[in-house]
Amino acid sequence: MALLQISEPGLSAAPHQRRLAAGIDLGTTNSLVATVRSGQAETLPDHEGRHLLPSVVHYQQQGHTVGYAARDNAAQDTANTISSVKRMMGRSLADIQTRYPHLPYRFKASVNGLPMIDTAAGLLNPVRVSADILKALAARASESLSGELDGVVITVPAYFDDAQRQGTKDAARLAGLHVLRLLNEPTAAAIAYGLDSGKEGVIAVYDLGGGTFDISILRLSRGVFEVLATGGDSALGGDDFDHLLADYIREQAGIADRSDNRVQRELLDAAIAAKIALSDADTVRVNVAGWQGEITREQFNDLISALVKRTLLACRRALKDAGVEPQDVLEVVMVGGSTRVPLVRERVGEFFGRTPLTAIDPDKVVAIGAAIQADILVGNKPDSEMLLLDVIPLSLGLETMGGLVEKVIPRNTTIPVARAQDFTTFKDGQTAMSIHVMQGERELVQDCRSLARFALRGIPPLPAGGAHIRVTFQVDADGLLSVTAMEKSTGVEASIQVKPSYGLTDGEIASMIKDSMSFAEQDVKARMLAEQKVEAARVLESLTGALTADAALLSAAERQCIDDAAAHLSAVAQGDDVDAIEQAIKNVDKQTQEFAARRMDQSVRRALKGHSVDEV
């Protein structure tokens, strides 16, 4: 673990000066910004006291508006009013048009197939639109805190891939923001409730927003959140509750005409108001389009019951993917404004067998968790005189066949962190695997530092490549590395703990990094050679087993050709010519193709023997 001091060159750190940091929940429907003041995390309102900022931007030739003012233009100027841009982040134009065919925007493709939205302000990509939302949030924070932000933590869905995460970072950079970290939304919600410092175990985060539903199953271990499974429904949210209730009110009021947009809007507004009122009251009076009537909570529950059930089915699937049962869940965190609906809380509580956490405003909980994390990462710790950022100074990885190092966690990764990678067996019938944990930047084991060794035993004796071993590296906030190896089919596992930074000076770390740069080209060539030698050994091992089992399938001449090709491969594999080894491997493959086909036919005949066509 390295401690990096971040400060302006030539200036001493001001020990009592708090750095300004914010947490940003960049949402699909609404966004928020929060900060920590006087030890308390709070979301920041606009001049009218509104904490939510609609994630909508309206573009004109002479500028743009963000938020409520932009949303008011949605009906009149649809093509220039961009909303739900988060759905487009990191996706190709073809992907967007397939997933969301009814978007009302004029799209064009960039040279690399990425989406560009044709607006009055010109062609804009989703990154630019997101940047304008982030700028509005940053301006609100800077005004409230009376200063420029030193850093932000931005939340993203747990299922966001690398392209979507990079797009979010690019948007922040375009907005002039320094991103301390991207934080998974469910993790942020758990942090807001202080679960990161509580008991270890499984946590479920149930997130029902306006347009989407997400369920995340997390495991907390030694201060690190690991995402076990995610799921949900991208076409289910609180908006669906509103539309069902609006249709019900329409029926009760006897309104048949659906073409009047003004009446449509009036019905929807009445439905939203009724939904909110029914969270606290058993009945509510509705006055809309000349009709007056009463709606009960029971009627509302009947309308939305099937939708709530759909969310619980998604929860069940996520739990199954995570390999846990509802009773294994330690806490359930509620996120999203639609979780205020009493029926939602009741059904979720029944499903998990425990009362969900609802003390923090579900609209604000993600932003609050992000603010808490930002306050820590920017260096606002008690009694701290400088900004300390904990990072892994040298890459951590494993030795693989051929004396190679497979990096699992690259250097400069902020901690705590957990990463997993799958490996497999090299030989037929292999029942044990030696795990050699390495540290360093070079490609070969001989040039890196050995941290620890342990063995995983009890692997089922399968053909080479048949067993799958998941190796998980986990570094906690104190820099303690835990490595766990688990065979997937049996669940058998072994683990070890080590302190990677123990015994290393800053000079030694710098020297190891310098060597990795100086010998980069040489190391790549050495790795390529080692990889080809490993592949040659695997091919020869597999061929030997096949010949032992089914040599009778070959004529003497065919056997001689295969033996000659194998002997040549064995000979060149002792040398250092990468191309020669590669060509020899290809030659063995060519000479054994017919043999492989005969073995396959024989296996099929054996499998079908004694069975009728109908049985097959």
From Swiss-Prot:
Keyword check for ATP-binding: yes
Pfam families according to UniProt: HSP70
GO biological process: chaperone cofactor-dependent protein refolding; iron-sulfur cluster assembly; protein refolding
NCBIfam families: HscA (TIGR01991), PRK05183.1 (NF003520)
GO molecular function, one term: ATP-dependent protein folding chaperone
Disulphide bond pairs: none
Listed CDD domains: ASKHA_NBD_HSP70_HscA
Membership in a protein family: Belongs to the heat shock protein 70 family.
Function statement: Chaperone involved in the maturation of iron-sulfur cluster-containing proteins. Has a low intrinsic ATPase activity which is markedly stimulated by HscB. Involved in the maturation of IscU.
UniProt keyword annotations, A-Z: ATP-binding, Chaperone, Nucleotide-binding
The keyword ATP-binding belongs to this UniProt entry's keyword annotation: yes
PROSITE patterns cross-referenced by the UniProt entry: HSP70_1, HSP70_2, HSP70_3
Record-level GO cellular component terms: cytosol
HAMAP family associated with the record: HscA
Protein's name according to its UniProt entry: Chaperone protein HscA
Organism: Salmonella typhimurium (strain LT2 / SGSC1412 / ATCC 700720)
Cited SUPFAM superfamilies: Actin-like ATPase domain, Heat shock protein 70kD (HSP70), C-terminal subdomain, Heat shock protein 70kD (HSP70), peptide-binding domain
